[in-house]
């Protein structure tokens, strides 16, 4: 009887431990964004690339999600966080508060800035057409007013759809996608590890 219990209990404990890791939570958050994009953004209008690693002058940069559309290019950074989130547009560091414990983390807009610059360089386009979008998934709660591009849950879809002015032709969108596909490193586990 004890052996039978252990046969079930040990795998359950292993799965429970895996589900609580930062790696799994990050992976899961990115999958939630993909799922929401699948159902809420027309694939013909908002063409997507996920897990894009580009070579930069100082190494590489990994971008969670890129949506290329006639209305601009949207660069998504996914954050899976719990607790209370405090931060401002101009602050270098934001704060996560969990049960009276404070954790500082880099302003995600600053983190995404490198991604924006890498895409601009790869595509030879100006900053007016590339938009930073920060997506917080998980049970975190904003406790300060956030910039419009910093969203929770599905708010990022509304933010992207708020851009209505056409800035790229279909031919330009296709050409940019081809350029990114050709210039990115293969989306493999080895690439992620090296980055």
Go through each PLM region and give its residues.
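Acidic/histidine-enriched active-site and ligand-binding environments that engage anionic O-linkages
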Residues: 87-88
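Surface-exposed interaction regions that form or flank ligand-binding interfaces
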Residues: 1-61, 68-73, 82-84, 93, ...
């Amino acid at each position: 009887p004890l052996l039978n219990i252990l046969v079930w209990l040990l795998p359950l404990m292993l799965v429970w431990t895996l589900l609580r890791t930062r790696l799994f939570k990050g992976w899961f958050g990115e999958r939630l964004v993909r799922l929401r994009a699948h159902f809420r953004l027309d694939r013909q209008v908002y063409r997507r690339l996920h897990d894009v690693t580009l070579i930069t002058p100082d190494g590489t940069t990994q971008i969670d999600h890129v949506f290329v559309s006639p209305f601009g290019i949207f660069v998504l950074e996914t954050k899976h966080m719990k607790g209370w989130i405090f931060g401002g547009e101009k602050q270098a560091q934001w704060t996560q508060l969990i049960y009276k414990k404070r954790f500082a983390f880099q302003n995600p807009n600053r983190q995404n800035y490198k991604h924006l610059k890498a895409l601009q360089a790869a595509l030879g386009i100006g900053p007016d057409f590339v938009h930073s979008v920060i997506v917080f998934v998980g049970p975190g709660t904003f406790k300060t007013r956030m910039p419009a591009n910093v969203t929770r849950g599905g708010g990022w879809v509304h933010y992207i759809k708020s851009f209505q002015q056409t800035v790229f032709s279909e031919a330009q969108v296709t050409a940019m996608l081809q350029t990114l596909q050709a210039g990115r490193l293969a989306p493999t586990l080895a690439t992620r590890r090296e980055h």
